[in-house]
Amino acid sequence: MSFPISKVISAGLIFLVFFSCKTSPVQQEETVSAVPKDTVYYDTVIGPPEPPPAPIVYSVDTFLNDYASLVSGLPADKYFGHFYLDSSYMRLERRSGREWNYMMENKINNMRAWSDTVVAPSSEAKALFYPFAGADFLHVDPLFHNVNRYVMVGLEPLGTVIADTGNKRVLKSHADKIYRSLYFSNRLGFFRTLSMRAELNQKELNGALPLLLFYIRRFGYSISSLEYFDLDSTGNVLQSDPASAIGLKIKFHDFKGPIRELDYFRFDLSDDGLQRDDRLIRYVSKMEPYGVYLKAASYLMHNSSFSSIRGTILNKALFVLQDDSGIPLSSFEEGAWERQLWGKYTRTISLFRGRYQSSLASAYKQGPSLPLNFYIGYNISHKECNMMWFRKSISINTTQSNNQGANQS
């Protein structure tokens, strides 16, 4: 008996489908019967893959990078070989190395691990705003290494690269002054405003730049560029020379990740200062969604004379990470912010005893508060440090994003 060739082919296809599927007989029957006899199968057509992102071009300013190595006690033989092999510099190099290793083992590594579980997973911020920072990049990198842009503000001058780089005596004095100015700050966990102001107003150490370069280089980054700039009345950047600049920008990288930017401003953030000149606030308002870090801030935002910067932070920041010297607990509207406490809080140092917050002590007592495995801030002297993480509630964030979109449309 003969069969039409089409039926033979159909039967063969059904046979192959039947034995190639690892399903139950019922499923097999349903699968076969669900396919119309006239169904035609096509391979899914996939378009060409999207091209990979353009590779990052990592440039290095070899002189600036060598200078950063010199001030941080690292090999600097490209431009400073005449001093790098000098016995006095080699002693400084050993001291700086021992001090940095101590900081890494006793503080920085713990901070970085803490940040990986607390800060990095909890915020979409692309930038960090650090008022009252001075040159404190020591705490910025380990706590916010997931952020690529940093805006730091202090009262210390911007500073420049030392002019007389060919003079061994001047270089030694310059490097020694940097080491001494940072030694106590590194151990204490904060900059002493009055002493730092005096130390950074000298001929051989005239501002924050060398200290920032010290930290950037010690954290393993290479320096791409340094620019000085001014701001127009709307907060847009204008080119400037160091003498008249309002800020400086350092670009740096580690040859692996993104190119990072650090802006340092010398600016008065008091209400009087911002009333005279609000360009910095306008500049910050143009930033990507940002978080805020506050540490050893002299309790300035507890005063009515710093209400403007306090209000800006509370209105615009996605998160605030701070110790008790930042914004008072009572300023964070309940329900608008998620809160987590770390460490311990029962008192302030005697210099700021008038800034004790009974509401904060009650919050710590009621809990929950989690242990903090590193020392930071004013209370480091009696080993009672605290950190507070405030994250704007999702509903508040969504409302602000919608409002920003409406304003931009």
Predicted features, each with a name:
Residues 10-18:
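Bacterial N-terminal signal peptides
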Residues 114-119, 212-219:
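Hydrophobic, Leu/Ile/Phe/Ala-enriched alpha-helical segments that form helix-helix packing faces
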Residues 133-145, 151-155, 188-213:
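Short, thiol/selenol-centered motifs that function as redox-active sites or metal-ligating centers
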Residues 217-282:
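Active-site/pore-lining binding-face segments in mid-to-C-terminal subdomains
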Residues 1-9:
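Bacterial N-terminal signal peptides that target proteins for export
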